[in-house]
């Protein structure tokens, strides 16, 4: 093992200790807004509310059972579109979507053979490591924080924790991230083969099928030579159908990208020789959802997701969940 590798190994242990010593609640900003949807809400209405509030997910609440009922994400809309787009009568399918309620989402997943997401959550005052491990085990990109009233036993939705917020919290509070200097191509991290890609001419619906079948949140857009041009994300689908115009799904990716909002976070790239210290610095200063690994000619070589980074950080023999220490000397990830 080289000195750089030895240093990185020691840094990982320090970062893991930091994660175990903090709670999920510590990651939350001082003030924030939480939007919760009742499961009786129409899918069409929920889509409009997500767009209006510029959010991509929301906790679900079953008011009849008085308990947390899961998390609404872009994957749910992708599954609904795939299910109804396969209908023999497209006009009837569109009319049915308009009458569809959130409580029917699990039935849609069953019919298209999609794996239903686990209704997982963690207590906000438990170790942040518990949240990281739960997200990794379920392959979730975010996890709800649920408290329970000690007297009534009623569940209370506190917030939703995302991979990005956790990694930004680490980047802001762990100086050890500057010691992660092993190049990506010398680490077991990321996806480097069998990449799902599309071209500017690919129909949006074909990209939606990729998103649903591969359980991914984005598809890189490349040209005939494999050069990275753009990315089509599941959130782009939300903006495309927000007005109820499902005919937009027949557009090409190139046409659909012209309808993308101006606040798009951009396409983040890196090289195979880049290191996690620089990537954590990027996460600290920019809203990064994933990084596309490219060569000097921008030819796509691999994809590094936030899940890849978080899993690399937490998976070690020292990742046993611990009892958080009570410390206030850190910054929340706003």
Curated annotation (Swiss-Prot):
Q: Name one GO cellular component term.
A: cytoplasm
Where is each CBS domain found? 29-89, 115-177, 187-247, 262-319
**Localization per Swiss-Prot or TrEMBL:** Nucleus; Cytoplasm
Give me the residues that bind ADP 2, please: 141, 191, 196, 217-218, 305-308
Which InterPro entries does the record cross-reference, listed alphabetically? AMPK_gamma/SDS23_families, CBS_dom, CBS_dom_sf
Write down the PROSITE patterns for this protein, in alphabetical order.
Answer: CBS
Annotated Gene Ontology MF terms?
ADP binding; AMP binding; ATP binding; protein kinase activator activity; protein kinase binding; protein kinase regulator activity
TM spans (from-to): none
Q: Where does ATP bind?
A: 141, 191, 196, 217-218, 290, 303-308
The GO biological-process annotations, alphabetized, read as:
cellular response to glucose starvation; induction of conjugation with cellular fusion; positive regulation of gluconeogenesis; regulation of carbon utilization; regulation of glycolytic process; regulation of transcription by RNA polymerase II; signal transduction
**Keyword field:** ATP-binding, Carbohydrate metabolism, CBS domain, Cytoplasm, Nucleotide-binding, Nucleus, Repeat, Transcription, Transcription regulation
Q: For binding ADP 1, which residues are annotated in this chain's numbering? A: 35, 142, 162-165, 287-289
Query: Could you say which residues bind AMP here?
Result: 141, 191, 196, 217-218, 305-308
Family label: Belongs to the 5'-AMP-activated protein kinase gamma subunit family.
Q: What is known of its domains?
A: The 4 CBS domains mediate binding to nucleotides. Of the 4 potential nucleotide-binding sites, 2 are occupied, designated as sites 2 (or A), and 3 (or B) based on the CBS modules that provide the acidic residue for coordination with the 2'- and 3'-hydroxyl groups of the ribose of AMP. Site 3 can bind either AMP, ADP or ATP (AMP, ADP or ATP 2). Site 2 binds specifically ADP (ADP 1) and is likely to be responsible for protection of a conserved threonine in the activation loop of the alpha catalytic subunit through conformational changes induced by binding of ADP.
Q: How is the subunit organization of this protein annotated in UniProt?
A: AMPK is a heterotrimer of an alpha catalytic subunit (ssp2), a beta (amk2) and a gamma non-catalytic subunits (cbs2). Forms a dimer of trimers.
- Function comment: Adenine nucleotides-binding subunit gamma of AMP-activated protein kinase (AMPK), an energy sensor protein kinase that plays a key role in regulating cellular energy metabolism. In response to reduction of intracellular ATP levels, AMPK activates energy-producing pathways and inhibits energy-consuming processes: inhibits protein, carbohydrate and lipid biosynthesis, as well as cell growth and proliferation. AMPK acts via direct phosphorylation of metabolic enzymes, and by longer-term effects via phosphorylation of transcription regulators.
Q: State the name under which the record lists this protein.
A: 5'-AMP-activated protein kinase subunit gamma
């Amino acid at each position: 093992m080289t000195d750089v590798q030895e240093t990185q190994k020691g840094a990982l242990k320090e970062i893991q200790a930091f994660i175990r010593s903090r709670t999920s609640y510590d990651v939350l900003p001082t003030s924030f807004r939480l939007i919760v949807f009742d499961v009786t809400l129409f899918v069409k209405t929920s889509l409009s509310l997500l767009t209006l509030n510029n959010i991509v997910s929301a906790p679900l609440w079953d008011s009849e059972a008085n308990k947390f009922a899961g998390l609404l994400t872009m994957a749910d809309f992708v599954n609904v579109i795939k299910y109804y787009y396969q209908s023999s009568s497209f006009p009837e399918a569109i009319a049915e979507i308009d009458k569809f309620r959130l409580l029917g989402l699990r039935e849609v997943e069953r019919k298209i053979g999609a794996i239903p997401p686990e209704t997982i959550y963690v207590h906000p005052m438990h170790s942040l490591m518990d949240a990281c491990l739960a997200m990794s085990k379920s392959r979730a990109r975010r996890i709800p924080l649920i408290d329970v009233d000690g007297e009534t036993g009623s569940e209370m939705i506190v917030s939703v924790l995302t991979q990005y917020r956790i990694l930004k919290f680490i980047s802001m509070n762990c100086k050890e991230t500057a010691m992660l200097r092993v190049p990506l191509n010398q680490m077991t991290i990321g996806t480097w083969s069998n990449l799902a890609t599309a071209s500017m001419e690919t129909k949006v619906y074909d990209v939606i099928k990729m998103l649903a079948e591969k359980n991914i949140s984005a598809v890189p857009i490349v040209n005939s030579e494999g050069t990275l041009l753009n990315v089509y994300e599941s959130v782009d689908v939300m903006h495309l159908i927000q007005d109820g115009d499902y005919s937009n799904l027949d557009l090409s990716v190139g046409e659909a990208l012209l309808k993308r909002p101006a606040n798009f976070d951009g396409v983040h790239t890196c090289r195979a020789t880049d290191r996690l210290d620089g990537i954590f610095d990027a996460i600290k200063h920019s809203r990064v959802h994933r990084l596309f690994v490219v060569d000097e000619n921008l030819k796509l070589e691999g994809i590094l997701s936030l899940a890849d980074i978080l899993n690399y950080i937490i998976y070690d023999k020292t990742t046993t969940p611990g009892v958080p220490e009570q410390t206030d000397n850190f910054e929340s990830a706003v």
